[in-house]
């Protein structure tokens, strides 16, 4: 058994009026997975702390109208990922905000925002090179990609190969 918190449910699964779901999805901030030290939002993407707080407030206000029982229904099928293992009597912590970790990249298939380069990569030339490599990959809309610390000294071809592997893995999971 596991525990799925309300804020860990992706809006695609919401069984609510379409207009409300679209409003929530339009304002949903990126889901950052704090369990991975390697992937974080790139600091130069132009979004301020205040902007994130406003988005979070709007999302909370829209979601406050609903109880979790209204949003997902009994026996509804959800694709979840374990983010924290079961411990004692507590069940595992689950999320529908998925992340697939490869050798050099982390693919977040249902996170439209987010992505970039690991914060642990501090060398400016490496960051610039990796940012160019990431933008050349043409990540589909609705997905996020983070280049991990292990990818810092890797070539564009190695990063692309890892990214393509993660995309194939995601397609296999979806089938």
Task: Give short role names for the model-derived ranges.
Residues 1-175:
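Single-stranded RNA-binding surfaces
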């Amino acid at each position: 058994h596991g525990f799925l918190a309300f804020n860990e449910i992706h809006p695609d699964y919401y069984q609510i009026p379409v207009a409300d779901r679209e409003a929530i999805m339009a304002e949903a901030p990126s889901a950052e997975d704090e369990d991975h030290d390697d992937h974080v939002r790139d600091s130069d993407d132009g979004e301020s702390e205040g902007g994130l707080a406003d988005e979070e407030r709007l999302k909370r206000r829209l979601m406050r109208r609903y109880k979790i029982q209204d949003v997902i229904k009994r026996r509804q099928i959800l694709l979840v990922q374990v983010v924290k293992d079961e411990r004692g009597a507590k069940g595992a912590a689950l999320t529908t905000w998925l992340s697939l970790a490869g050798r050099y990249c982390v693919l977040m298939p249902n996170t439209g925002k987010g992505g970039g380069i690991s914060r642990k990569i501090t060398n400016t030339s490496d960051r610039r090179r990796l940012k160019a490599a990431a933008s050349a990959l043409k990540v589909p809309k609705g997905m996020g990609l983070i280049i991990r610390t292990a990818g810092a000294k890797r070539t564009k071809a190695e990063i692309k190969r890892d990214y393509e592997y993660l995309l194939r893995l995601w397609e296999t999971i979806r089938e």
